[in-house]
Amino acid sequence: MAITINLRATWGQYAPWLRQEHASLPPVPGEPWSGHMGVFLHYLGTGSTSNLQTEEDCRRAVAGVYEDHVNSSEYEGDIAYNFLVCPHGHIYQGRGYERGAGNAGKAPFIEGVGRNEGFYSILGMIRSQDVASEAMLRSIRNLIDHLRHEAPRKTGKIILPHSFQYDTECPGNLHMYARQGTTIDPSAPWRGPADIYVYRTQKWVNATYIAAPGYVFCPETGYTGWNTVLSLTQGLQHELGISPTVQNFGPGTFNAVKNRESVPEFERNENLLRLYNGALWCKGYWASQFLGGWGEESEASLRQLYADMGLDHANAGQRLAMWPHVLKSLLRMDQFRLVPGGDPHVRAIQQRLNARYVAGIGIPAMSLVPCDGIYSRDVQQGLMMAIQYETGIALGSINGYFGPGTQAALKGRGSATLTGDLRYLFRAACYVNSPTYTANGQAHYLPADIGTDARTGTHVGWLQAFQRFSQLPVTGHNDYATWAQLLVSSGDTSRDATGCDCITEITPQRGQLLKANGYHIVGRYLDEHLAPGDEGYLGKALKPGEPQAILNAGLRFFPIFQYNGTELGNFTYDKGYDQGKKAHAKAAEHGIGAGTCIYFGVDYDATDEEITSHVVPYFNGVKAALAELGSRYTFGVYGSRNVCIRVSKDAGARWSFVSGMSWGFSGNLGFPLPENWSFNQIHEYEFQAGWGLDHNIWRDGGDPGVSAVGRG
């Protein structure tokens, strides 16, 4: 990597006059020296570098380090460090590529190699009260990459703090970066600056509870995550007398917090205060820098957290009653401030759910929902519980599931004229399912319609558009089918559908049965990657002559291709390219005509990150293969709503086949039906003994499927 290293002369001019010439000269070679092992990180010592405002300040500071070292016999008459990196990200030459003297050469050897003989030394120009700037960290990362790949004497993979096997506080707050795999390691992903208070929390919780039964050590990285908050949870359990500790904030932990009847401002157990402060730091709220104290900084952040959750901190009774809920949420990765991509109107819905149904009604099964503006699985479950309450389901029976009791309640009270809170919840469900689509493009639900009791024209218009797009009866009313479509991706699973798919061969007799039961199109698999005799073999592939048998029964069919679509490892560009070619060959073998859409399956709950890293590249491979073979066939995608939306947008899928019956998938929560949906798989059932069938809504004007075949 090309980097700029400022030579000694840039700072040598600031050395005392009698030493300026020596300070500015190139470094003198020293022996023994190889530098092949790695790097040590250093800092300037105690205090603050708040005086390093300009680059001239930094050059003077480097000259000051030189002056300290040149007067000491310990450093062999020169500045000790090979390179120095300032807060502005500028890199300065010290000993450069020659042997340095800053790594505590008399300390124990590492793998038989002396610390000054085998390691470069890099000084980050911070002191004990400072944290490294992003510019400094990026430059250290780039410098290490340069030393590994471009330096005259290339170094190895090791990254260590000066304190490794040596009694020193150095490198101060750079400790959390001074190892392999951190953000300064060019072989690891860039993560940006870590949080020193999260790091100190991680160090403290590990040191304090490592001997507690069941305790799991959390990585000391300075970045929060599930590992950290679960270790904090175990620390909490230990302080509350729960043993062995477990990585779960369950009913036992909740009740132990509740029975303590104390909020942080009145807590006298310093370890509990350390846990609470650490949890605030991990959640991104400022807290006491002394973990064992609870001052105004911590209390102010807690007040803000209550407000962010939609709770009333000023109400002493509610503050105490909600504390177990608040602490449980603190010790999770839920966010309560608007995150990038979050919607403030969704956040208002989330806060209202917390205020009314957790703090107000006190639904026993309901936890605080995140308030980040993202409609997630937990928020969907909270909304479902609120609807269950407002439709008359007993508190003890509320569970957040779209089961028979909920369905019956929605067919009754839910389908009557709505007022008050139930009307609000219905309209909130409309908003989180927005946009829907019309012939003119996207139709967004108006935020102003969420909280009004008026039956506005904009509300009715959107609702009718949603029903029409979802292929429901267009009533403009809160009927059961509409409720179901708003709440779960499968919608009303009892509704009629003209599409289906299966792994079973469609014989002439089976084709006639499908036709007689109202089906007009069936999805069938082009191939199977397992051979007969394999324990996982399903026999799902189209059989010779089967396409014509389907057509002779008065049906159409649509081709599906899926090899190991349930595993992330299947989704790479190369596998997509290979499977695209196989799908083309199989479709042509069966005489399927040009222009047909082949659906490639993503049959698991792929996260947004996995869609970006694996699924989209896979479909780009499919696209390249089909194009290389003349673009005889187009490609579609089978998967959750989010998978279908992303693959259609980022890879160009023609049609979407939505796995709507997987209503628990995160990719089916908070995402609308894709604009290009053609099939919505809503129900799986046994059509006949041994013949399982998926019940699919086939969209009017969608993919026409295959209506004729030629010779293969």
Predicted stretch roles:
Residues 1-115, 169-170, 482-565, 654-665:
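N-terminal catalytic cores of peptidoglycan-degrading enzymes
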Residues 1-48, 87-193, 625-704:
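Basic/polar, cationic surfaces and motifs that engage anionic cell-wall
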Residues 37-43, 80-86, 90-94, 119-124, ...:
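Structural recognition of the beta-strand scaffold that forms the well-ordered cores
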Residues 58-65, 140-141, 508, 539-544, ...:
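Well-ordered, non-membrane alpha-helical segments in soluble/globular domains
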Residues 79-91, 160-166, 224, 294-297, ...:
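Acidic helix-start/capping segments at beta-turn-to-alpha-helix junctions
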Residues 170-521, 525-530:
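Cell-envelope/ECM-targeting effectors and their regulatory/trafficking segments
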Residues 173-178, 605-629:
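Active-site cleft segment of glycoside hydrolase catalytic domains centered on the general acid/base Glu
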Residues 534-606, 610:
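Substrate-binding cleft of extracellular glycoside hydrolase catalytic domains
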